[in-house]
């Protein structure tokens, strides 16, 4: 994946992570309504942040490799 593609991926994942975080926040604010949705919302939030962290690491490594080249 090119540096530009990695940067685009990180930006998109960052937006998804922000949306997931807000969904979890909104759910928490409305408790006890929809408390059954906590596991699925938390799992989705965890998954997107895990993916974002991996993409950020890949981008950082790619930038470092580009600097050394």
What kind of feature is each model-predicted range?
Residues 1-29:
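N-terminal acidic leader/helix
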